[in-house]
Design a protein with these regions (language model features):
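Basic, Lys/Arg- and aromatic-enriched nucleic-acid-binding interface segment
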Residues: 62-66, 70-74, 85, 89-142, ...
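N-terminal DNA-binding recognition helix of tyrosine site-specific recombinases/integrases
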Residues: 21-28, 34-45, 53-95, 141-143
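A structural signal for short hydrophobic/aromatic patches embedded in well-ordered alpha helices
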Residues: 18, 47, 118-119, 186
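Surface-exposed alpha-helical interface segments used for non-catalytic interactions
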Residues: 42-45, 74, 116, 180, ...
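Short, intrinsically disordered, charge-balanced linker/junction segments flanking boundaries
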Residues: 1, 183, 189-193
Length: 193
């Protein structure tokens, strides 16, 4: 309930993460409440170590990744920071504990040969293929392409094209350049937009 009250405009993924942090906190404390007066640097360090070996959710086997643990610990620290602001804590304990370091993951990109192979590969669903290729050329997520309308594809003052989308995940506008090849995948622009 506090999630929807404090963060009414949060995306589903943010809410899922907050809930998962709650589940893992209960798991750490074996279902017992953790009173504010017992929260200490040592407790947070213990929780940090717990998160680094915490189980995956659902029916998945194994432990969460270090980057997921980092996200969850940041959420926990944000909650404690808010508890300090709301005067449930007299000390900003969140500032006294370092977060979990994220591991940089290399971004995997398709080579031009791989893209050409995809272009040349037959597909029964032409719309799906064009949407996939549009995604490759623009960097837009499939979920954002599904809701994309012509009025969101605009010509800039320099004569180039861009897609203006409200990112489903972040709820913020994002401006993605649309090259001519990507524009051609969209077909003919209707008069009614």
């Amino acid at each position: 309930r506090i999630i929807s009250t404090r963060h009414p405009n949060s995306s589903d993924s943010i809410i899922v993460n907050w809930r998962r942090v709650g589940e893992l906190s209960k798991m750490y404390s074996q279902g017992q409440p953790i009173p504010f007066k017992t929260i200490s640097v040592k407790l947070l360090e213990d929780i940090k170590m717990f998160l680094l070996r915490a189980p995956m959710g659902g029916n998945k086997k194994g432990t969460i990744s270090q980057n997921t643990a980092s996200t969850y610990f940041s959420i926990l620290k944000a909650g404690l920071k808010q508890a300090f602001i709301d005067e449930y804590l007299t000390v900003d304990i969140s500032a006294k504990v370092k977060g979990i370091t994220n591991i940089e993951k290399p971004r995997v990109a398709l080579t031009m040969n791989e893209v050409q192979m995809l272009v040349d590969t037959p597909c029964k669903d032409d719309v799906l293929k064009r949407a996939f290729l549009f995604s490759i050329l623009t960097g837009l997520r499939h979920s954002d392409i599904q809701t994309l309308r012509w009025k969101q594809i605009q010509q800039t003052s320099k004569g180039t094209w861009q897609a203006v989308v409200i990112q489903q995940k972040t709820k913020r506008p994002d401006y993605k350049p649309v090259i001519q090849q990507a524009l051609q995948l969209c077909g003919i622009r209707p008069d009614d937009d």
